[in-house]
Amino acid sequence: MARHAGRGWYGRVIGAAIGVTAVAAGASVWTAQAGQNTPAAPAHHTTPKTVAVSPVIAHSSDGGAHAVNITIDDGPDPTWTPQVLQVLRENGVKATFCMIGPEAQAHPDVVKQVVAAGHRLCDHTVSHDTAMDHKSESYQSQQILDAERQITEASGGVRPMYYRAPGGAFTPYSRKLAASHGMRPLGWNVDSKDFERPGTDAIVATVRSELANGPTLLFHDAGGDRSQTVAALRTLMPWLKQQGYGFGFPVR
C-alpha cells in the first residue's frame, strides 16, 4: 500500500508514515489505448526450489499494453477479503493479493481461498513498516523472509510470487533479496486512495482519472471498513471491460 496515516489496526506497525515513496523507476511506458480482453495467465504453482527473478520493480502487465493488474494490499481479512474475492469471481478477474505475514498466519483459510480461486500471492512484510528503507539489512531481511514463510505456510505451500515494500519503501538490498527468493518487486501506477475511505464515487473517479499513469492498480482489503473498496471494484471492473481493457498479472 501507499504510505498513509490513520491505519486502524496498524497500531502495531513499526515506523510512521512519511510521504509517498516514488516507485516509477524502472516502470515501462504505459499505453492508455484500450484493446481486447486477454486470457487469464496461469496462477500460482508450488515449486520445490526458488527460481530467481528480476530485481527491477515491476509495473507492467503480462496481459500486454491493453491490460490492467488488480492488486489488493494489507490482508487477508476474514470479513473483506472474501467479499473482494466474490466481486472478482463475478467479473471473471484474477488479482494479486499482497499479504501481511501475521495476517496470513492468523487467517490461513482465507489465504487458501485466494489461492484456490487462481489469484497470486505477494509478500507485504511482517509489520508493514513504511520506514523500513531506513532500517538495517538484517531488519529488512527479517521482515521479508519471515513474511514469505508465514504466507507460504498459510497457503499450504504456495509461495508468494511478488514482494511489495510497504509504502514503496524499496531498497537495492530488499529488491535483490526478494528477487533471489523468486519474488519480483512490485510497484503500482494508480493508487485508488481507497485506504482513506473517501467514498465509493471518489475511489472510482480517482482510478478513472489516473488510469493513464499505468496498468497496476492499488486497492486494500484490510485496515478498516473496506465496503467502499468492494463497491468501487464492483463498478470499475465492468467499466474497464467496456473501455476495452483486459486483466493480467504483473510481469515476472
Show which residues each predicted segment covers.
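N-terminal pre-catalytic segment of deacetylase/amide-hydrolase enzymes
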Residues: M1-I70, D77-E90, K112, T235-R252
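Active-site beta->alpha N-cap acidic-glycine motif
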Residues: H44-K135, Q143-D146, Q150, P160
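Soluble non-cytosolic domains of exported or imported proteins
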Residues: G75-P82, Q105, S138-S141, G168, ...
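A short acidic, amphipathic alpha-helical/loop segment
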Residues: Q83-V84, D109-V110, Y173-L177, A232
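CE4/NodB-like, metal-dependent polysaccharide N-deacetylase domain
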Residues: L85-T96, R120, E137-G168, K176, ...
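Short histidine/acidic/glycine/proline-rich micro-motifs that form metal-
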Residues: G101-A104, S127-T130, P166-A169, D191-D194, ...
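His/Asp/Glu-enriched short active-site or ligand-binding loop at hydrolase and phosphoryl-transfer sites
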Residues: A169-E210, G244-R252
